[in-house]
Amino acid sequence: MLKVAIVGASGYTGVELLRILHSHPEVAVTCVTSEQSAGRPVSSVFPSLRGRCDIVLENLEPVGIAEKVDIVFTALPHKAAMEVVPTFMKMGKDVIDLSADYRIHDADTYGKWYEPHLNPELLPEAVYGIPELRRAEIAEASLIANPGCYPTSVILGLAPLLKGKVIDPRSIIVDAASGTSGAGRGAKVDNLYCEVNEGFRAYGVGGVHRHIPEIEQELSLLAGSPLNITFTPHLVPMDRGILSTIYSQTAGSVKAADLIALYEAFYDGEPFVRVLPEGVLPSTAHVRGSNFCDIGITVDQRTGRVIVISAIDNLVKGASGQAVQNMNLMCGLPETLGLDLLPVFP
């Protein structure tokens, strides 16, 4: 039985980790931390856990935590994670970091989009944790940079096209819409009910969203050369889910049926990627609460553009579910263990 710590358990990704790991047959969550709620049962912070998970939240003391667990999930904001991850690593613990701190390979790029990196020497050790693309590397890693939610939906949506050199990599435009849980649990005026309800708005417009360098880094690796994208995120009045609509120009004449066959071959055997039939498009309602990524593909024959639509639950495949998938690979467990989560519908 693996002993697991969740560092930063009072946010949405933290409680989602607790929900998933509670049903994992090979895991015991033995430590959960929260600076704001230390000393309280986690079920007092999240009443949904009442009677099933009443473990008491602790203060964040990395050495003490490392002494009593086998693996650590860090569900902290950026910067806070890189302040504690080195201690866990030095004490020989495998770490799955859900922040942005180890996703970007280049320290200067990270510094440009976030702030100076505190331990750039760890960046080469961190494996970007998309199992569908990095399964062998993840299995050998000690530090996983769990991907962001938007990047997961975009990268899985584009990987077959870029690897297959079907599209012009300079032509990529992404419109992505997320539920409000993607902004975290902290109190913000922009996320109040009256600010969000009955509205639909873009934000981070003009190439300034912090997920852009992460997306471009991974897409460039798939394409085999550097590329830039136009990425515009949107906030929609729902709790969870991401729908990414991805546009790109084809290198020649293509049919939707041929592209679907390409995707089916690329993701053959993947337990959590569902390529939809021609004429069927994804909905966030059909992946809610699950670790699935649903992908639909069509072609605008008038303009020669491929349109890919991908849907994920931002808290599961976009965060905590993918983190557990990575843990399974790191620990030599069946990849789907604890993740047989049917979507919640309606």
Curated annotation (Swiss-Prot):
Record-stated family: Belongs to the NAGSA dehydrogenase family. Type 1 subfamily.
Keyword NADP part of the UniProt annotation: yes
Gene name linked to the record: argC
Enzyme class: oxidoreductase
Reaction(s) catalysed (UniProt annotation): N-acetyl-L-glutamate 5-semialdehyde + phosphate + NADP(+) = N-acetyl-L-glutamyl 5-phosphate + NADPH + H(+)
Pathway, per record: Amino-acid biosynthesis; L-arginine biosynthesis; N(2)-acetyl-L-ornithine from L-glutamate: step 3/4
UniProt cross-references to SUPFAM superfamilies, sorted A to Z: Glyceraldehyde-3-phosphate dehydrogenase-like, C-terminal domain, NAD(P)-binding Rossmann-fold domains
Keywords: Amino-acid biosynthesis, Arginine biosynthesis, Cytoplasm, NADP, Oxidoreductase
SMART domains named in the record: Semialdhyde_dh (SM00859)
PROSITE patterns: ARGC
Major subcellular location class: cytoplasm
Domain of life where this protein originates: Bacteria
Protein known as: N-acetyl-gamma-glutamyl-phosphate reductase
GO CC, one annotated term: cytoplasm
GO molecular function term, any single one: N-acetyl-gamma-glutamyl-phosphate reductase activity
Organism, as annotated: Geobacter sp. (strain M21)
BP-aspect Gene Ontology terms: L-arginine biosynthetic process
Described function: Catalyzes the NADPH-dependent reduction of N-acetyl-5-glutamyl phosphate to yield N-acetyl-L-glutamate 5-semialdehyde.
EC identifiers of the protein: 1.2.1.38
Active-site residues annotated for this sequence: C149
NCBIfam families: argC (TIGR01850)
Protein localization: Cytoplasm
